[in-house]
From Swiss-Prot:
Record-given protein name: RuBisCO chaperone RbcX
Record note on what altering residue 103 to A does: Can be readily crystallized, functions in RbcL8 assembly in E.coli
A single GO molecular function term of this UniProt record: protein folding chaperone
Alphabetized InterPro entries for the sequence: Chaperonin_RbcX_sf (IPR038052), Chaperonin_RcbX (IPR003435), RbcX (IPR046381)
Principal localisation: other
Annotated family: Belongs to the RbcX family.
GO biological process: carbon fixation; photosynthesis; ribulose bisphosphate carboxylase complex assembly
Pfam hit, one: RbcX
PANTHER family from the UniProt entry: CHAPERONIN-LIKE RBCX PROTEIN 1, CHLOROPLASTIC (PTHR33791), RUBISCO CHAPERONE RBCX (PTHR33791:SF1)
This protein's UniProt keywords: Bacterial microcompartment, Carbon dioxide fixation, Carboxysome, Chaperone, Cytoplasm, Photosynthesis
Amino acid sequence: MDVKHIAKQTTKTLISYLTYQAVRTVIGQLAETDPPRSLWLHQFTSQESIQDGERYLEALFREQPDLGFRILTVREHLAEMVADYLPEMLRAGIQQANLQQRCQQLERMTQVSEANVENSNLETPE
């Protein structure tokens, strides 16, 4: 297991997600202050894949550099706000999700075992 590679890929995914959130934030801000630009950014976003945040921003900078810089600023602000909470929330979230999965699997296994016992009791002649 290459932990460094996993960390890099996780970081890339998180950066793209924060880019997505920054775009949503800017679209919302523009909807209140400049509806035509909000509509333009919304349409641009529907045409350009935001899956890779960096490629999305490169395309946006070619079209509307000021919006690109605005999204960079919002993304950086979001990263600063989230960074303090993320490690503990990640650990707690994984632990909780794993616990729920284990409980559900145990319930399924128990139900299957009970069904097998009931079926074997029905098949046993008395």
